[in-house]
């Protein structure tokens, strides 16, 4: 144990709840479950957790510490490492600030900053005058986020703030495709996240009106899981692609990724290995009527946790270690992208961590892509094959979603 580690004791009246929420492998009495089969909080929050058989004596109850940010005349830097930081960035952008993020780690004044660190400079925000630091400190203080003052654009180690490894970005205009052909729960998750957590403006557009949409009115278009009929129209699809090539950014989630794969975008659904051995036993196809509800389970994955290997040098994975635990709700994985594609999140053989996976799917869920980015002209398409915002519960996926909206493509 290290100073500052949190101890959750099982010696308490809610010990059964502690066990249910923290045990790494959920125990299912019956695999015929109607909902997700794994929900361990350390995976959902992206935390390192350890179980101990012996009772651990800990100190006083943890008390939140209050951050006090000091004044600066040149600029601030803040770490990019969670949803609270993303909320601060969203609010600063709405106030008209131009921000920068670091593509590479750097060190300044004894502090180490990882990829994605947010840089706020006076030279980029002259129009705000003396209000710049008042606005910045007020928003950071309200969210208890530490700001690190800097006195120049030079750093002790790494790339200086004026280098090509530091990218500026402004507030993007974001649209969410909705309507009867879009999964209402999937769209609702995104809408709720923007409205209740980021407090960032979002324009809702009916996907059936795609032929009449002026895509150039927006910087980012979010496609939740759904059936996008306009992708079956070559003219409408080409208009959509043309907007992307001119600098538009798309964030596609779940089934929307499969829709784009079918519309000849740069991602392809991975098929089962042709070389897999098939059962040649004639009697293997025989089944009992009693098991009619259970047989389909061999090809199902009702919300299981898989470990995804991340390329955290790409902006989509900034703020993460070299891995991410995803909640897998379907059997879709994609081929590794080539040429203009970046394979940011991939799964390898033996990636299962917790939950139920049908016996016929275990060999399929390997050597494939789940999270990636396709460069298309001056724009990008971000593919998130799994639901990173699942029911506002999968906390560790929220930063990746913010990366896709604010950082990727800038």
Give each language-model segment a name.
Residues 1-410:
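Intrinsic-disorder/low-complexity accessory segments
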């Amino acid at each position: 144990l290290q100073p500052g580690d949190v101890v959750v004791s099982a010696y308490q009246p809610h010990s059964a709840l502690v066990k249910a929420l923290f045990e790494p492998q959920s125990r299912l009495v019956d695999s015929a479950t109607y909902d997700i089969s794994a929900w361990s909080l350390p995976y959902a929050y992206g935390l390192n957790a350890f179980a101990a058989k012996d009772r651990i004596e800990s100190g006083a109850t943890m008390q939140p510490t209050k951050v006090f940010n000091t004044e600066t005349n040149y600029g601030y830097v803040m770490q990019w490492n969670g949803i609270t930081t993303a909320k601060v960035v969203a609010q600063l952008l709405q106030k008209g600030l131009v921000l920068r993020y670091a593509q590479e780690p750097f060190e300044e004044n004894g502090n180490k900053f990882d990829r994605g660190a947010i840089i706020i400079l006076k030279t980029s925000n002259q129009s705000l005058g003396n209000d710049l630091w008042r606005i910045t400190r007020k928003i950071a203080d309200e969210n208890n986020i530490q700001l690190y003052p800097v006195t120049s654009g030079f750093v002790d180690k790494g790339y200086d703030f004026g280098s090509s490894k530091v990218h500026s970005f402004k507030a993007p205009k974001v649209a969410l495709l909705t309507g009867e052909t879009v999964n209402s729960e999937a769209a609702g998750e995104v809408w709720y996240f923007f409205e209740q957590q980021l407090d960032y403006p979002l324009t809702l557009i009916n996907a059936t009106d795609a032929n009449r949409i002026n895509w150039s009115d927006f910087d980012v278009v979010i496609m939740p899981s759904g059936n996008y009929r306009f992708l079956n129209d070559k003219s409408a699809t080409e208009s959509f692609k043309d907007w992307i090539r001119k600098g538009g950014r798309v964030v596609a989630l779940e089934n929307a990724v499969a829709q784009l794969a079918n519309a000849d975008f740069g991602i392809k659904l991975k098929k089962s290995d042709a070389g897999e051995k098939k059962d040649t036993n004639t009697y293997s196809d025989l089944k009992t009527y009693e098991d009619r509800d259970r047989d389909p389970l061999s090809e199902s994955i009702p919300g299981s946790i898989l470990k995804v290997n991340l390329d955290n040098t790409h902006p989509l994975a900034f703020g993460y270690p070299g891995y991410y635990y995803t909640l897998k709700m379907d059997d879709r994985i994609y081929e590794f992208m080539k040429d203009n594609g970046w394979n940011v999140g991939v799964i390898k053989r033996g990636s299962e961590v917790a939950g139920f996976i049908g016996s016929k799917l275990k060999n399929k869920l390997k050597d494939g892509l789940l999270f990636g980015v396709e460069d298309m002209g001056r724009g990008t398409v971000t593919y998130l094959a799994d639901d990173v915002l699942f029911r506002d519960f999968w906390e560790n996926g929220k930063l990746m979603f913010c990366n896709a909206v604010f950082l990727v493509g800038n």
